[in-house]
Swiss-Prot record:
GO molecular function, one term: structural constituent of ribosome
Organism expressing this protein natively: Thermoplasma acidophilum (strain ATCC 25905 / DSM 1728 / JCM 9062 / NBRC 15155 / AMRC-C165)
Pfam family, one: Ribosomal_L6
Family to which the UniProt record says this protein belongs: Belongs to the universal ribosomal protein uL6 family.
Taxonomic lineage: Archaea, Methanobacteriati, Thermoplasmatota, Thermoplasmata, Thermoplasmatales
GO biological process: cytoplasmic translation
HAMAP family the UniProt entry points to: Ribosomal_uL6_A
UniProt keyword terms in alphabetical order: Ribonucleoprotein, Ribosomal protein, RNA-binding, rRNA-binding
SUPFAM superfamilies for this protein: Ribosomal protein L6
Protein name: Large ribosomal subunit protein uL6
Amino acid sequence: MINWKEARSIKIPDGFKVSISGTTVTISYGGKTISKNFANNYVKLVEDGSTIKINASKNNSMVRGIVGTWASEINNMIKGLKDGFQYEMKIDYSHFPMRVSVKGKTVVIENFFGERSPRTAEIVGDTTVTVKGDRVYIAGISKKDVGETAANIERSTIIKGFDPRVFQDGIYLISKGE
């Protein structure tokens, strides 16, 4: 018999609807829905009215780390549904002007260092990407998806074999407007 003890509880704000089925947590607010799978043998989630309780079967550093991570992820889900996440990136070039556009679920970077073939970066999840002048704005309700999309864009402009202190062309994250 496992002795489950409450490790942490998260209060759900008014207007949010939470459902836990098995190991999947689904949170809805204002017509938007986000869900995430939380599966672990030592930690489980229990819905109790307007709170989500994180119960743990052990009290060691590994389990405490999982509890803290899950609490942070649930709080980020609530914050994402309420306010959203928006990152801002800057297009930086010295000689060859880059053309950045969004086509479907990819960001296309043309004329990077005068290259003939365009570079692409994947847009993850329900993230929206807009390009205005020399700025790229990434917005969405999932912090993980927004951050991963920004990383994909920044990684697609890496120049291999050159000193990055000298060749500073690329698209760089300048603001996490959370």
